[in-house]
Amino acid sequence: NGERYIIPLKNISTRERYDMPGRGLDALGYRKESDGSITLLLAEAKVSEQKSNPPSVVDANKDSLYKSQKIYHDDESMVLQRLTEYLRHISVTEDTVALGCLVLLIQAKQKEKYHITYGCGLVRDYTCLDKDKDFGKFKSSIDEFRPGRVNFGIFSFTEKTIAETVELFYKKVI
């Protein structure tokens, strides 16, 4: 609907430094929709200067964006685990109420009242970028995430090294 997601706490800021990457979701957010439903955002980013397109962090590695997001798509208990873990780290606000409602809706299997967006970010050296191929399975096998939605973004800055790009990315999200 064009509205931005609310991300009450960026997981990345509590567990990572730009020079020491962690594993798993980097951000968890939500958006209230005009029809009264809530959309959950499960977001993860990976960095690659690998010359192949797509780089293995997209869909080949064991912990690739594709494989880790498929785990959340295929296993609601993992989504619930992340949501409840996340709720322990934020103070009681409107955000807590919205995310708590998501927990209840998922547990009650009221799928018409919530949606999931799988957010994927690829931080890429501009010399390696191929905007047609870097999406990998997220383009060729997008139907595997239905009824969810995939948002895939590539972050690349001309004239910036991968280290400079990563530093810019982390300064923005932390």
Where are the model-predicted features located?
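Short, solvent-exposed loop/turn segments that connect beta-strands within catalytic domains
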Residues: 33-38
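Acidic, metal/cofactor-coordinating or nucleic-acid-engaging core segments within structured domains
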Residues: 51-130
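Short, catalytically relevant binding-site loops at active-site mouths
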Residues: 14, 47-50
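A short acidic/basic microdomain associated with nuclease active sites
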Residues: 2-20
